[in-house]
Amino acid sequence: MSLFKGKTLMITGGTGSFGNAVLNRFLKTDIGEIRIFSRDEKKQDDMRHDFQARMPEVADKIKFYIGDVRDLQSVRGAMPGVDYIFHAAALKQVPSCEFFPMEAVRTNVIGTENVLTAAIEEGVESVICLSTDKAAYPINAMGITKAIEEKVAVAKSRMSGKTKICCTRYGNVMCSRGSVIPLWIDQIKQGNPITLTEPSMTRFIMSLEEAVDLVLFAFENGENGDLLIQKAPACTIQTQAEAVCELFGGKKEDIKVIGIRHGEKM
């Protein structure tokens, strides 16, 4: 972690699963400060209390900033003194983005442009933008906006001065907030059949730790304008569901197929 010694890292959308994973890994290192930039004060308060309870000796390294990536002025307000940025703020639920596509544009596209504009103005050293495999040959609003986010990052990298801008592209991050595995676990605990959309649907999968590793790899090895994609194992949703049943005592015969959601890929 010597590259982070005494440095200030800002994580946009930092109260999510990725932000928590970064804090768990970084707080006990020699990093100077981690800024959590997000719009939900309740999630910030929950995170503050959680880390004060679990890591009281280093919790004061976390600084919380209320703001929204859609608002350039609020992004600028959190930027002074920042050395590095992990840009994780996004709308990522496929059906939500499908029903409200302009909301996805405002967060995933305009929000990214705002973060990069403010970072370049402030002379931030490095920005890593988190994207998704759904940006490849996109068929839904979420994938389309994340593909444009990548284009925005590449375009900004051509005029970024000393600021290095890279993107990483993820598969499905297991057990992240809003993903299907926590839903299945809750359904099993409640004694209900687990629901899946389409058994033959295939997804690339990775753990939260692998997600953090990919961002760190991009941070350490990426060149300005790069898009880094990790090779990841793939499996069907049926296989995932059966594995969760085995681990948590669910019944495979109770798996209930509910059909593909709006905008989903096979």
Label each PLM-derived region with a short phrase:
Residues D30-D46:
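Conserved glycine-rich Rossmann-like NAD(P)H-binding loop of the short-chain dehydrogenase/reductase
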Residues K7-T29:
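N-terminal Rossmann NAD(P)H-binding glycine-rich loop of SDR-like oxidoreductase domains
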Residues S38, Y65-I66, R106, E198, ...:
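Conserved residues in the N-terminal Rossmann fold of short-chain dehydrogenase/reductase
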Residues K63-Y84:
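Conserved Rossmann-fold cofactor-binding substructure of NAD(P)-dependent oxidoreductases
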Residues Y84-H87, L91-K151, A155, I165:
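Conserved Rossmann-fold NAD(P)-dependent oxidoreductase catalytic core, especially the SDR/UDP-sugar
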Residues N114, C175-L183, T197-F217, C235-V244:
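Substrate-positioning beta->alpha
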Residues S126, V152-T202, D226-L227, E253-I258:
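Conserved beta-loop-beta element that borders a ligand/cofactor-binding pocket
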Residues N221-M266:
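Mid/C-terminal beta-alpha module of Rossmann-like enzyme folds, strongest
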